[in-house]
Amino acid sequence: MVKNNAGIVNMFEKRRTQTTTIPIIEIMREKRSEDLETEIVQGLQFDSLQLPQELLWDDAGQILFDDLCNSSTYYLTKKEKEILQKYSTDMAATIPEGSTLIELGCGSLRKTGILLSALEKSHKAVTYYALDVSQDSLENGLAQLHKGLGCLDHVELRGLWGTYEDAIAWLADQHPINVHNGITFLWMGNSMTNMHLAQAQSLLSRMTKTCIGSGIPCQILVSVDSCSAEDIVMGAYDTDSQPLKDFIMNGLKSANRILGKDVFCASDWTFGTVLDRVRHEVQVFYAPTRDVTIHIDSHPCKITKGEKIAVISSGKWPEPYFRSMLEGIGLQVLDLWRDSDQFYCMNPLPLICSFPG
């Protein structure tokens, strides 16, 4: 058991700090704003309208999501933090000496400090990379992480500025001698389930196969929310929640910034959430409060009052569902940790998976 974990977490309360000398590698291959503009236009031409979820994760969105994570009804962060505080020593034991730890979509890095502290106390030389699409969030998150952990003798902190796809391309260029003891991917916050099942399978498969193709052993430490209690789930995504509203509606501001003009007038839009029991996910969408016509270049799009535009989903995957997904791409669960309540349906489930053979 790692002592004083709560103290480590409390050091991250201040959001902004002066950036440190922690190296950040820019791995972004293309200007993401141009890609997003194309995705916005294309998404509004589909029969089922959609906007890219990356609109939610700009610099302002990262801060607003942090507010959501700290809200009273958002159980995911609390459960995951509890698991980390209880099992961080066990998790650290699965990460080899001299290996690389890459966190996918690192966000504020509050919870990460618990695991890195356990690695430091176990005297394991590990190189930690925080991957994020937001440069501002990455710089400030790493600075706060460095401040919270203090002087590190064994764990080295670095950053990767880019997307998941950029990370896969970057991994393909890594020589085994640089990561001879392998890579552990850390994917927390239930972020994997923001993708649909097939998308998550594809990303996991490509990450592991890229490592195997480069001769690099790898494993994945991932948290999954499998809560089936609908009142608890929908309480976390209550549309009356101001933190949730601020976070989701910021996505339209982000879209306007990407497009270079106010295409989405805030007063014309609201958002909603719905539980899809078949897909085991909460779906979040925008909807206009009146009939609107959106003009983007030569692509006018008429949207009727109440018509849904999907933006993000959050999976609530039961264990059999998740295991089946892994088996479909040749992965297997090696270990599993739950929170102390032992209510499976309420717990994010950190799992370690490896690529067999």
From Swiss-Prot:
GO molecular function terms attached to this record = methyltransferase activity
Domain of life, per lineage: Eukaryota
Class of this enzyme: transferase
Q: Which Pfam families match?
A: Methyltransf_33
Q: What happens when the gene is disrupted?
A: Abolishes the production of ditryptophenaline.
Enzyme Commission designation: 2.1.1.-
Stored PANTHER family: ERGOTHIONEINE BIOSYNTHESIS PROTEIN 1, HISTIDINE-SPECIFIC METHYLTRANSFERASE SAM-DEPENDENT DOMAIN-CONTAINING PROTEIN
What this protein is reported to do is described as:
N-methyltransferase; part of the gene cluster that mediates the biosynthesis of the dimeric diketopiperazine alkaloid ditryptophenaline. The nonribosomal peptide synthase dtpA accepts L-tryptophan and L-phenylalanine as its substrates and forms the phenylalanyl-tryptophanyl cyclic dipeptide product cyclophenylalanyltryptophenyl. The N-methyltransferase dtpB is responsible for the N-methylation of cyclophenylalanyltryptophenyl to yield cyclo-N-methylphenylalanyltryptophenyl.
User: Hey, which family's this protein in?
Assistant: Belongs to the methyltransferase superfamily.
For this entry, the protein name equals N-methyltransferase dtpB
Which organism encodes this protein? Aspergillus flavus (strain ATCC 200026 / FGSC A1120 / IAM 13836 / NRRL 3357 / JCM 12722 / SRRC 167)
Show the taxonomic lineage: Eukaryota, Fungi, Dikarya, Ascomycota, Pezizomycotina
